[in-house]
From Swiss-Prot:
InterPro entries: UDG_fam1, Ura-DNA_Glyclase_AS, Uracil-DNA_glycosylase-like, Uracil-DNA_glycosylase-like_sf. Belongs to the uracil-DNA glycosylase (UDG) superfamily. UNG family. It catalyses: Hydrolyzes single-stranded DNA or mismatched double-stranded DNA and polynucleotides, releasing free uracil. It comes from Streptococcus pyogenes serotype M6 (strain ATCC BAA-946 / MGAS10394). This is Uracil-DNA glycosylase. Transmembrane segments: none annotated. The active site is at 62 (proton acceptor). GO terms for biological process: base-excision repair, AP site formation via deaminated base removal. CDD domains: UDG-F1-like. Its EC number is 3.2.2.27. It is an enzyme of class 3 (hydrolase).
Amino acid sequence: MAHSIWHEKIKSFLPEHYYGRINHFLDEAYASGLVYPQRENVFKALQVTPLEETKVLILGQDPYHGPKQAQGISFSVPEEISAPPSLINILKELADDIGPRDHHDLSTWASQGVLLLNACLTVPAGQANGHAGLIWEPFTDAVIKVLNEKDSPVVFILWGAYARKKKAFITNPKHHIIESPHPSPLSSYRGFFGSKPFSRTNAMLEKEGMIGIDWLQ
């Protein structure tokens, strides 16, 4: 289901047989209609960013619900797909903060230790938040709790009110939190623009003796 170390750690924060419930949910959801991302990519965020390499978390809400957008990592879309509004604003803030990045696929961030996690890992086509409140939040809350237990520092980037509620799970004083309004067009001008999350993250990592993220890669 997921990277094995992730799997063992996450399981300790969930009720017994919860993974079985997730599999049953996925069987029913994918059998009953079009769901994003493709099933093999539901746990991609955990597969491409191993726990031992994770040093940044960017928490999204749920996958993009349009055709060919969702990849299994938050905010990212395939290179040939136009950037959705939130990603446009993320790249605009990145350009103002560090420099321009022309591509929309954020997989290179994931390979550097940036866990691009959505709180809800699936969505019905065309129905934003259509799977919210059903199965995923205990699982992804467990991911945050696992990261909170890490001995090495993690920078948690929390955009928007929904993500900021997850601060309750981040109690380890070794970690850092960067929070701001969400990059969506509805809230980006309320404090997301100008928040400089990318340079601030690297400053925090480098202060801890860790290698910063090449956000432009």
